[in-house]
Amino acid sequence: FASAGPETLCGAELVDALQFVCGDRGFYFNKPTGYGSSSRRAPQTGIVDECCFRSCDLRRLEMYCAPLKPAKAARSVRAQR
C-alpha cells in the first residue's frame, strides 16, 4: 500500500489506511473546521468524498490525522484519573 499511487479506498480499507498513516494519533472523517480557505466557499467534504468517491494518496490521508498531543498533556490526563 505505501508504495502505491493514488487509489480509491472505501470502508474497512479506508479505515485500515488511516490507521496505518496516523498510527496512535487517531484520525477524523471530516477535516477540522477552519481547514484551509476553501472551506468557507465549498460545503465540507470528508475523507469518503476524497478517497472513496475519488482517489487520494498518502499525503491526502495524512490531512485527516489527529494532531499529535504533547507528552506532558498526556501524562497529566492520566494522573487525574
Swiss-Prot record:
InterPro entries: IGF-I, Insulin-like, Insulin-like_growth_factor, Insulin-like_sf, Insulin_CS, Insulin_family. GO terms for cellular component: alphav-beta3 integrin-IGF-1-IGF1R complex; exocytic vesicle; extracellular space. Residues 5-33 are annotated as: B. Residues 34-45 are annotated as: C. Residues 46-66 are annotated as: A. Keywords: Disulfide bond, Growth factor, Secreted. Residues 67-74 are annotated as: D. GO terms for biological process: cell population proliferation; insulin-like growth factor receptor signaling pathway; negative regulation of apoptotic process; negative regulation of release of cytochrome c from mitochondria; negative regulation of smooth muscle cell apoptotic process; positive regulation of cell population proliferation; positive regulation of D-glucose import; positive regulation of glycogen biosynthetic process. The insulin-like growth factors, isolated from plasma, are structurally and functionally related to insulin but have a much higher growth-promoting activity. May be a physiological regulator of [1-14C]-2-deoxy-D-glucose (2DG) transport and glycogen synthesis in osteoblasts. Stimulates glucose transport in bone-derived osteoblastic (PyMS) cells and is effective at much lower concentrations than insulin, not only regarding glycogen and DNA synthesis but also with regard to enhancing glucose uptake. May play a role in synapse maturation. Forms a ternary complex with IGFR1 and ITGAV:ITGB3. Forms a ternary complex with IGFR1 and ITGA6:ITGB4. This is Insulin-like growth factor 1. It comes from Suncus murinus. The gene is IGF1.
